[in-house]
Amino acid sequence: MSGHSKWATIKHAKGAADAKRGQLFTKFIKEISVAARMAGGDPQANPRLRTAILKARAANMPKDNIERAIKKGTGELSGSSYEELVYEGYAPGGVAVLVEVLTDNKNRAAANVRNLFSRNGGNLGSAGSVSYMFNRKGVIEYDSEQVDEEALMELALEAGAEDIQNAGGVLTVTTVPGTFETVLESLQAKGWESLSAGISMVPDTYLALDEETARKVLKMIDRLEEEEDVQAVYSNADIPSELVL
């Protein structure tokens, strides 16, 4: 499995899913709250909120948590106000890295992300330094042993998927952002449980790494994803399969 598989990176970085569930839910709460604050608490009229809720549900986040997050965003309940930031830079080996942040303290987030880059052999760059290497895509991933591959491919394409790939036992469905929700809802209706689902930054090309460099890159991604304010980390690293399984 290559490192550009989002699930592979998350699987390696997060370890046991149950141990990190609270941290994951915290990220969903921030995203849902921000989406509701920006465009209202009605998912049908707010595509970003609708997508955030779909992601939370895919991770089995309780309905009550979702509803509270929406109310915090709309102001019905008190809560922090979050700012969206994107940091760009390089990991060891020249790997391009994008870090998406939601924070209630911009200075804290900037200092922490910068320190994590420098302490792990990376370099934080300026805006635009690596983002041109990525495109925003909808990405949905499934364990190929848990779904009917032929049926999934047929349904996904009918619903508007752009591409479906099977690598290392993971089926990756790629969409343009505009069809992500339609495709995900169609697949969810079949009862298939995804490994991950969301709007991701997908690199145009991937950078192959030797084992030593790959370990350094994965360590850096680990540390970034563990940071409280970090919502997502994307890279163009192609990780050797033995390091992510």
Curated annotation (Swiss-Prot):
The keyword Transcription applies. InterPro entries: Integrase-like_N, TACO1_YebC-like_2nd/3rd_dom, TACO1_YebC_N, Transcrip_reg_TACO1-like, Transcrip_reg_TACO1-like_dom3, YebC-like. This is Probable transcriptional regulatory protein TP_0474. It is found in: Cytoplasm. Signal peptide: none annotated. Pfam families: TACO1_YebC_N, Transcrip_reg. Belongs to the TACO1 family. One of its GO terms (biological process) is regulation of DNA-templated transcription. One of its GO terms (cellular component) is cytosol. One of its GO terms (molecular function) is DNA binding. Its main location: cytoplasm. Keywords: Cytoplasm, DNA-binding, Transcription, Transcription regulation.
